[in-house]
Amino acid sequence: MAYDRLLERLYLVDNDWIVKGATALLARDLAVRATIDVDVYRQASSREIAEAELREAAGRDIGDWFTFEIGERRTLSEAADGFRLPVKAFIGTAAWAAFHVDLGGDELHVTGEPEAVPALARVVMPDVEQHGYLVYPLVDHVADKVAAMFELYGVDGAPSTRYKDLVDVVAITIAASLPAELQITAIQSEATHRGLRLPERFTVPDLQLWGRGYAREAGRSLLPIARTLDEALAVVSPCLDPLLDGTARGNWDPEQRRWVKSSLTE
C-alpha cells in the first residue's frame, strides 16, 4: 500500500517514471520474493533532478491520509551510478511502513518498451485515484538478470552470488511469455554493454557455491517448484539455452515450457 501511494504521487509530478526491480515483478504478478525497496528511474533525467522530483512528490497531499518522509541519500554499494533513499510512510501520525527507494537516472540500457500495469494495491476511497505504473520491459529484466549471473565482481573478479536473480528467472520462466527475437537482442545488447562474452548454454559460475546459496534463497521465496539448483537449471535451461545460442524462435510458452513458433513464422 505504501509503495503504491508514493508511486501515485511520483506520477503526478512526472508520468515518465519507470518502475524496476522486484516491485516491477510484483506489479506483473511475477514476484516470488519479498522486497523493502522500490526501484525507479526516469530516462533523460539526471539522478539529482530525479531525487528532487521524488522529494517533491513525497510532500504532496492527495487526500489518502498518507504522508512520507525521505531521508538522506547514499550511493548504492552494488552500483555506484545509483542512489538509495530511506522512506518512512505514515497514516496520520502513526508510522505505517519503512522502505527504500533506489533511484536511477538516464544511464539505463533498455531494448524493449516500458509496459503499463495496474496499481499494486487497489484503494477504495472517495476521490482517490490510482493510475497504475510503467514498468521496466520484461525482456530487459531477464537480460539484466542473466548478465548479472555471469558478471565478475570486485577487484579480484569474484564470481556472481546473485542467487536471487536465478529465483526471479525461474519465476518468469514458469509464468510469463517472452518474444524470442526481442529477448535475444536484449541479452546480446546487455552483454555488450557490460563487456561480457556469454556462453551458449546456461550454467552458474560455481555449482557447489550456488547449490547452497540458491537453495537458501529459493527456500525463502514463494516459488512453487525448483527449490534446488538442479531443479532450477532444469526449469530455466530450455528457455535460456536457445536464447544464448540464438536459435530461439517465436515465443516462450510458460505452460509448455518451450519455445513455440507462431503460425506466421512456421
Model-predicted segments: where are they?
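Structured mid-to-C-terminal alpha-helical surface segments
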Residues: M1-W17, L26-V38, R42-E266
